[in-house]
Amino acid sequence: MASIRRPGRASIFSPATEREREENFESYWLYQQRRDGEILEDAKDLSEKQKNLARFRADTVRTRWPVPDTFHRNYIAMQDDPRSLDRRTLLLTFLYKFARHEWIGISAAWDECPPVARAVHLIDKISRYHLAEEFCHMRLFQEMFRTFGLDGVEWGPLPKRTKQLYGAFARLPGALVAPPAFVSELMGLTVYQQLDKMLESIVGDEPDVRDRIRELLRAIMTDELSHVGERRNFMGPLGVRVAKLMVRPMFRAFFGGIPEARLLFDTRQMRKDAEAFDYSTISPEVLDVSWTPSYCMRP
């Protein structure tokens, strides 16, 4: 089915002046505080998101169909032929690998980013909130696993060498970090969009489970959409050109490392969707509560 295009929205790659980008950082910072509330540094949490998670946990939804043992054998690394797994198990093993990749990156970046109270520049405050939002997403992912009866899923210890590599990446000059960081957010958004579309076919036989996973997913997706705009705002004209060139190799490298991906998604089409990303294709349920750069909105 073709995406529904809505007027008034433009490409994420739309040009922006330096002044527009400065104004949009101010706008985004206000949006973050309004949506997230107070940052809880020690807990790597945000007050409003903490309340939202508590509401989910107070209204428990659990599947009536236990996840097979093949999940436990394959969720960290694929041991079996992925074609032998049913689609629900395949989705869950992919989701774990995807989320753990995120967790490793944000855990290393957190140690390199100053707390809000010590941040000198606005972009440092924005980045700290951004990382706290990502940690909140990890809790929502865990809630998804609990919905499927997988209460013991954890992300495991952070490999020392991996932490060092991610930490070194976080210390690079902003102009070097901005394009790959932007593409990473764009890649995440395309994954969430595809997951949202496939829920009916995979868990439609349990409407309460389907609806709960969709609620959790869209809470993450709303932030991810705002992160795409935020990361776009870090880039000048050269950064935008570099980001466009990085989409293809980054998509290939990431999805090529997860065997489940090619069985669940049309990753080639996802890459094309990212290269042509347009806010007009986002559902109003997500778009209306997220944040969009002003230069990506047509008058």
In which residue ranges do the predicted regions lie?
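Non-heme di-metal
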Residues: 1-299
